[in-house]
Swiss-Prot record:
Residues 241-253, 453-466, 615-625 have a biased composition (Polar residues). Residues 14-44, 201-225, 254-293, 307-411, 467-532, 547-594, 726-736, 752-771, 801-821, 829-842 have a biased composition (Low complexity). One of its GO terms (cellular component) is cytoplasm. Rho GTPase-activating protein involved in the signal transduction pathway. This is Rho GTPase-activating protein gacZ. The gene is gacZ. GO terms for molecular function: GTPase activator activity; zinc ion binding. CDD domains: RhoGAP. Residues 825-852 form a coiled coil.
């Protein structure tokens, strides 16, 4: 928007201009609030102006014809719409220029467009008319007693403030007015010009009066500059700040207002994207134009005013009284462009500059105005009768932080929620773990209007400050009594929470080795003395209570760990892993009782029932199990005593006959130490090569008996335990042992009596061992009795088959001897059988002849090259199938197909069947059969004669020289290969080159080279070159198909 010349139409009321950054136009139009001008002058309108106004009124009444999109001039349909109103169409710029005089008054987009040239032309025409035709009017009454200076502080991010008084403010304060050259009519402008003439005459009289008066002590700077000459900007003094206005003058603005009648209104906008409509109601009073007549033109009055201003002295006087002490301190923003006009009874407005500081001893009377976030308009109404001072006190010495927003409750709630969310532990504690709440005292300061959620301390209790590293800002207010502050840093994974209560006597440290987190809780009145405590676990599962650590010393020190602490009511968690203790005999009481446990064994590893139920001596006795420590029967069964001092538990067998029951020597009682980890776990089972029973496979292997060594029965992985040599031999053949015993007794009669006694004692020992071992082995064989019966049945069937064969042979031999007439028939049958055998052999020979997998390539070409003279059918069919159906398959040649389907295809090709690969639905099966055939060729496609040449081609990397050398070497090398090998490589590389250009396959050149390089017996670099430069290498290859 352009403004008219201030020398003609007077100064502007409000020279503040704001840019519209986000296309939010907030025009503060004072439409219904400002009263109209009382034009009491008899203005004679020229006929031209009257005619123009009538034409404009008629044009506004006539609606635009927008039914058809045709040109207004030539009615053409190849048109473009007017960008201003979007309602009129033209076929080109020429017709638009022709119709523009008629259309410009009707275009609705003139108010939205910056049509500066058109407005400038209108302003020039208006100046010429006003200079030629000046009419007198009545006396003008200027209302300059109530002057208001409007400051708009925009502290928000994006504030669009357009403070413009359009079409409604007919007269300005101090002789200034804001006019719009595109919307104000000519008669109204004339009335404004006439009123300005009267104002200029008053200014001339004021200047003459001020020249006659003596200069005062205070300095004043006129805020009404001359249009032709500008005042130089004065030096910046304390308490003043210069501001650049749109008219070009540098006007200092006093931080403390000087006149008591002027009111300052500051609207502070702290919101984002707020549209502030400052409607000045009843402040800019309309001017009554009572000008009845005037003599001379505007030019003469301006010259007279200029001469009077040039002739005045440097020190001017002012009738304004001395400024009163300020009631408030106001610091305007540098973005404001406004003129403060203070009236002191004279026509010319002066701005008195006080050299006092901005602060005064009088109390600051301030009213804080906060804008709501949801409000889109902020209207500030200033009445002339009231004097309000709205400002913002920004004192840096304040201890409380006063924010510029009204979100006291909502923002505090959000901050508290964020702080609590940041303290949440997302890691170690399990779902059942109840995290205690810390007693934090939050003191809300009701005196201040800032409820920012900070943690405040009291003099009697300690508080915890939570410093969050996850972008959360906490405003902490420092108080006087800061005794104990535990700063807990809530990081992403490590959470350290220490609850320090008044009586820190004992520490209950729960160490979790699995999660590497340590819980530390300081309880108030919970004393633990672990010198003579006995813990007896009566649960059925008997899980060891690890993770407990006891401190006998009553100390107030606390350990900072990485897991939230438990409360005093929460018992320590039980864990099955190894624990730690800080005092001796923490798990074993004074009476020798210990905490039992259960070891979880691997699958298919059997364990005796006594061990399963043996986890506590009292438990065993209560359930009816005999003690395994003092009972001799248990020792005879092979369960020896446990020695706590050993590192590991030995295997439960009775190989050593000298020990009591095959166990180990040691103390029967239990020591104070715990069982080791692998104490009850059985070791691997022993086997012997003499006789091995493989229960899984169902086969029985026999070996010759060794008389010098007893047999030993070894059970497979599904068996439970291993057995001794003597008992195994006695169980397998008890009758032989009895005969051996009796034989030894009979042979002993020839000896002496001493030898007889020794033999008797030995036999007694053997019998006692036999009775104990047989009872144990019988129980074991009950478990595997079913399997033995099955194997016996297998043996029985084998023997029956053998017997039937023997009997059939014997019968055939007897029949030949008895019936001589049947020899011919028998010979014929034998001949028939021989013929059948020969036929079967011929079929096998035919199958061997049709095999193509695993034979040399030359023979395969001779056998199966029916579709192509140089390529076997399996390769040719596979390549053509993949070219049609698998060239866009993802992961072709990389993903493997079904192994069973590939095997079936291989068998069909080996039998010589004409296989139709198009019946296959899986492309990966066909690619797998192709790779299988190339892999099973005895010699690779490049043969073994060119190993050194291929190695030389590999050297060089990916440089241009190495690639060119590789291409030339590959051409020469292919020409030296057999034609079938070269032709297969030609077809294969053609397919791979086409696949490399398909993005859906996700198989590039390097991926394909990695797949086929080992199969073809070549390096990856050479294979990549063969695929990438297929045209250069194979384009010159020729083949002799006639051979």
């Amino acid at each position: 928007m352009t403004t008219t010349n201030t020398s003609i139409f007077g100064p502007r009321v409000n020279n503040s201009k704001f840019n519209n950054n986000n296309n939010n136009n907030n025009n503060n139009n004072n439409n219904n609030n400002n009263t109209s001008n009382n034009n009491n002058s008899n203005i004679i309108k020229p006929p031209q102006v009257v005619q123009e106004t009538q034409q404009q009124q008629q044009a506004q009444q006539q609606p635009l014809q927008t039914n058809e999109e045709v040109c207004v001039i030539c009615k053409s349909k190849n048109v473009q719409v007017c960008t201003g109103c979007l309602m009129v169409y033209y076929c080109g710029a020429e017709h638009q220029n022709i119709d523009w005089p008629n259309h410009k008054s009707l275009c609705s987009g003139l108010n939205r467009r910056n049509d500066l040239l058109d407005r400038a032309e209108k302003s020039k025409d208006l100046r010429k008319k006003l200079q030629s035709d000046i009419f007198s009017s009545g006396n003008r009454v200027s209302n300059s007693n109530n002057n208001s200076s409007i400051y708009s502080n925009s502290t928000g991010n994006i504030n669009n403030n357009n403070n413009s008084n359009n079409n409604n403010i007919k007269g300005g304060i101090g002789g200034g007015a804001v006019t719009n050259s595109s919307t104000v009519m000519a008669p109204e402008r004339k009335s404004i010009a006439i009123s300005n003439i009267k104002h200029l005459q008053q200014q001339i009289q004021q200047t003459q009066q001020t020249q006659q008066q003596p200069p005062p002590t205070t300095t004043s700077i006129p805020t009404q500059p001359n249009s032709s000459s500008f005042n130089k900007p004065t030096a910046k003094k304390p308490g003043t700040s210069f501001k650049s206005s749109s008219s070009g003058d540098n006007t200092p603005i006093n931080q403390s207002p000087s006149s008591s009648s002027s009111s300052l209104v500051s609207s502070t906008n702290n919101n984002n994207n707020n549209n502030n409509n400052n409607n000045n109601n009843n402040n800019i009073n309309s001017n009554s134009n009572n000008m009845s007549g005037s003599s001379g033109g505007i030019k003469a009055l301006q010259n007279q005013l200029q001469n009077s201003i040039n002739n005045k002295p440097s020190n001017t006087t002012s009738n304004s009284p001395n400024p009163s002490p300020p009631s408030s301190t106001f610091v305007p923003n540098s973005n404001n462009n406004s003129n403060s006009n203070s009236s002191s009874g004279s026509g010319k407005s002066n701005l008195n500059i006080s050299l006092k500081s901005s602060t005064s001893s009088s109390p600051v009377t301030s009213t804080y105005l906060y804008n709501n976030n949801n409000s889109n308009s902020n209207s500030n109404s200033n009445n002339s009768s009231t004097e309000t001072t709205t400002c913002i006190s920004s004192n840096s010495n304040n201890s409380s932080n006063i924010e510029n927003s009204d979100n006291t409750n909502e923002e505090n709630g959000m901050k508290n929620i964020k702080n609590k969310l940041s303290q949440i532990n997302f890691g170690a504690p399990p779902p059942s773990f109840k995290k205690p709440t810390s007693k934090v005292i939050e003191n809300e300061d009701n005196n201040n209007s800032n409820n920012d959620g900070t943690l405040k301390q009291s003099s009697s209790s300690d508080s915890i400050y939570f410093n969050n590293n996850n972008n959360n800002n906490n405003n902490n207010n420092n108080n006087n009594n800061n005794n104990n502050n535990n700063n807990n840093n809530n990081n992403n994974n490590n959470n350290n929470n220490n609850n320090n209560n008044n009586n820190n006597n004992n520490n209950n440290n729960n160490n979790n080795n699995n999660n590497n987190n340590n819980n530390n809780s300081n309880n108030n009145n919970f004393d633990i003395n672990n010198s003579n405590n006995i813990i007896n676990n009566k649960q059925s599962t008997c899980s060891s209570i690890d993770g407990l650590s006891y401190n006998n010393n009553n100390s107030g020190s606390s350990l900072k760990n990485s897991v939230p602490p438990t409360t005093s009511n929460t018992p320590p968690r039980k864990r099955s892993s190894g624990g730690s203790s800080s005092s001796n005999n923490s798990n074993i009481g004074s009476n020798g009782n210990r905490i039992g446990f259960i070891k979880e064994h691997k699958k298919n590893q059997s364990l005796p029932d006594s061990f399963v139920d043996f986890y506590q001596s009292n438990k065993n006795q209560s359930n009816g199990y005999e003690s395994l420590l003092d009972n001799d029967d248990n020792k005879t069964r092979g369960y020896g005593s446990f020695n706590e001092n050993d590192d590991s538990h030995e295997e439960c067998d009775d190989d050593d006959d000298d020990d009591d029951g095959g166990g180990q020597d040691g103390d029967d009682g239990l020591d104070g130490t715990e069982f080791k980890r692998g104490r009850n776990r059985p070791t691997g089972l022993r086997t012997n090569n003499n006789a091995v029973f493989e229960w899984e496979s169902g086969t029985i292997e026999y070996s010759t008996n060794n008389t010098s060594q007893h047999k030993k029965l070894g059970v497979g992985s599904r068996g439970g335990n291993s057995f001794s040599k003597d008992t195994q031999s006695q169980s397998t053949n008890s009758t032989t042992t009895d005969d051996h015993q009796t034989g030894s007794i009979l042979n002993s009669n020839s000896g002496s009596s001493d030898d007889l006694q020794q033999q008797q004692t030995q036999t007694q020992q053997q019998q006692s061992q036999l009775s104990a071992g047989v009872g144990r082995i019988a129980g074991k064989f009950r478990m595997i009795g079913g399997d033995i019966k099955k194997k016996a049945a297998i043996v029985g069937t084998l023997t029956k088959n053998k017997v039937s064969e023997v009997t059939s042979k014997s019968k055939s031999s007897t029949s030949v001897n008895n019936n001589n007439n049947d020899e011919v028939d028998h010979n014929e049958n034998n001949n028939n059988n021989n013929n059948n055998i020969n036929n079967n052999n011929n079929n096998n020979n035919n199958n061997i002849e049709n095999i193509i997998f695993g034979i040399p390539l030359e023979e395969a070409v001779k056998k199966s090259a029916t579709l192509h003279p140089l390529i076997p059918d399996v390769i040719y069919k596979s390549i053509e199938y993949i070219r049609e159906k698998g060239i866009q398959e993802e992961g072709i040649f990389r993903l493997s197909g079904s192994a069973n389907a590939i095997t079936l295809l291989k068998n069909e090709f080996d039998r010589g069947v004409n296989v139709d690969l198009y019946q296959q639905l899986d492309q990966h099966v066909v690619s797998g059969i192709l790779k299988l055939y190339l892999r099973q060729i005895p010699e690779t496609l490049f043969t073994q004669d060119f190993g050194e040449e291929l190695e030389e081609l590999r050297v060089g990397g990916n440089s241009s020289d190495a690639i060119s050398k590789r291409i030339a070497g590959s051409i020469i090398l292919l020409q030296r290969l057999p034609e079938s090998n070269r032709c297969i490589l030609h077809y294969l590389c053609n397919l791979l080159n086409a696949i490399s250009f398909e993005p859906s396959t996700k198989m590039g050149t390097v991926n394909l080279a990695i797949v086929f390089a080992p199969t073809l017996g070549v390096s990856v670099e050479v294979m990549t070159c063969l695929i990438s430069y297929y045209d250069e290498i194979f384009g010159i290859q020729t083949y002799n198909y006639n051979s």
